[in-house]
Design a protein with these regions (language model features):
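Bacterial carbohydrate/catabolite-sensing allosteric modules
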Residues: 1-59, 69-310, 315, 319-320, ...
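Residue-level signature of transmembrane alpha-helix interfaces in integral membrane proteins
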Residues: 235, 377, 393-395
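Residues within the helices of the helix-turn-helix
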Residues: 305, 331, 354, 370, ...
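C-terminal end segment of the histidine kinase catalytic
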Residues: 368, 392-399
Length: 401
């Protein structure tokens, strides 16, 4: 028996990464189920919200974090499924079937990741109160509840909107806040965009990441990942599942089933761990300074002598400090940093191996081949193929239970 054909409107901003992932989840449900839907996705749907009641389709899946969309759909004559953030107060949920990203679980995952690194101080970089971003306040409330319940103090700063005309003022205020914090400290940012702003300001004021401040964002936005010198750790939201579950829910409603009375909460996918939270409790300030320089410059082909010049101590002095703190030499630290970068690029990019060798500071492709043979008994190509054939997540991606 064939499914009845339906016309479904998606009210999302396809220019946003979060929305695109949700839309992809809806599309995947179409591909894997028997639904026969025509999907309508307008680029400028906000300009036509007032005429939504004239639409003669069969169902709507919409971004209910947007108050204008909520208002426009109050008198909708077709089944509506809302997608948005979760709320601690059940009374805050809209009066429609609702699929929510679990804000408390997102913050919990970020907090646990930092605590597992041995971090004992916490801060939260949020966002100004905004009716279009109520999820930001929910995440702030969640981090305060979690840290207090575990016996930790949490420093909170909402900051200001980041705009070109107020950039200097906003950056100065953020820098002042960062300088006031005790270190070492772990900072949870409300989004990857705010986390990237943190990393930029830390770089400007000479705050060492992650030794003094470990930073983790929320979204795992690829753009934010590549726009900072230090790669950003982030909690990956279950956006794909949000879309998939919303489509499944609407499908059931169109078949006459009653929707659930409670919202469906979607947990985060995982924590993608990168340099910004690669915290190791280093007490020696000279080693900490050297580590910062090595992270920033290892792939530029630096030698031990340049590290010594940067730190300003003798080789024997710094080598002894390194062996005590890190268990190996300065040269090994440089080598490990380059190798780790090469491994990540082989796993996560489609760059040619020759280009990766160049980017990671190896004198030649043949040299990188020799390094991989020595460490993994594989060529770079064999290493890449093995990683792609591995069904398990990258060893630097921690699954959230």
């Amino acid at each position: 028996m064939f499914e009845q054909k339906h016309s479904i409107t998606l009210l999302f901003n396809a220019n946003k990464v979060y929305d695109r992932r949700v839309i992809a989840g809806v599309g995947d449900y179409l591909q894997t189920s028997k639904v026969d839907w025509d999907l309508y996705l307008e680029e400028d749907f906000m300009a036509r919200l007032e005429h939504l009641d004239e639409w003669s389709g069969d169902g709507i899946i919409a971004d209910y974090d947007n108050p204008e969309i909520q208002a426009a759909l109050q008198k909708a004559k077709v089944p509506v499924v809302g997608i948005g953030g979760s709320y601690a107060n059940p009374a805050d949920y809209p009066d429609v079937p609702y699929v929510a990203t679990d804000n408390h679980a997102l913050v919990q995952a970020a907090f646990e990741h930092l605590r597992q690194k041995g971090i004992q101080r916490f801060a939260f970089y949020g966002a100004p109160v905004n009716e279009h971003a109520r999820w930001a306040q929910e995440r702030e409330n969640a981090v305060l509840e979690i840290t207090r319940s575990q016996g930790y103090e949490c420093y909170v700063y909402r900051g200001h909107p980041v705009r070109p005309e107020t950039w200097q003022y906003t950056t100065k205020r953020l820098a002042d806040w960062l300088k006031s914090l005790p270190t070492p400290i772990g900072i949870i940012a409300v989004t990857d965009s705010r986390a990237r702003h943190l990393l930029q300001v830390c770089d400007h004021i000479g705050m060492i990441i992650p030794d003094k401040m470990s930073v983790i964002g929320i979204d795992d936005d690829e753009l934010a990942r590549y726009l900072s010198r230090v790669s950003l750790s982030s909690v990956r939201q279950g956006c794909f599942e949000l879309g998939e579950q919303a489509a499944r829910l609407l499908h059931k409603m169109l078949k006459g089933h009653n929707p659930p009375k409670k919202p469906i909460l979607i947990a985060p996918e995982c924590v993608a761990e990168r340099q910004s939270t690669d915290f190791k409790a280093i007490s020696d300030p000279h080693v900490m300074q050297a580590m910062h320089y090595i992270r920033q410059n290892a792939c530029r082909g630096i030698k031990v002598e340049q590290v010594l010049d940067y730190v300003g101590v003798s080789r024997s002095n710094l080598e002894n400090r390194f062996r005590e703190e890190r268990g190996h030499s300065i040269h090994t630290e440089i080598h490990n940093e380059k190798l780790q970068r090469a491994c990540k690029m082989l796993e996560n990019s489609n760059e040619a191996t020759s280009q990766i060798a160049k980017i990671c500071g190896y004198p030649s492709l043949q040299y990188m081949y020799a390094v991989f043979k020595k460490h993994f008994n594989q060529t770079p190509k064999e290493y890449r193929d093995a990683m792609k054939n591995n069904d398990e997540e990258d060893s630097l991606v921690l699954q959230v239970s």
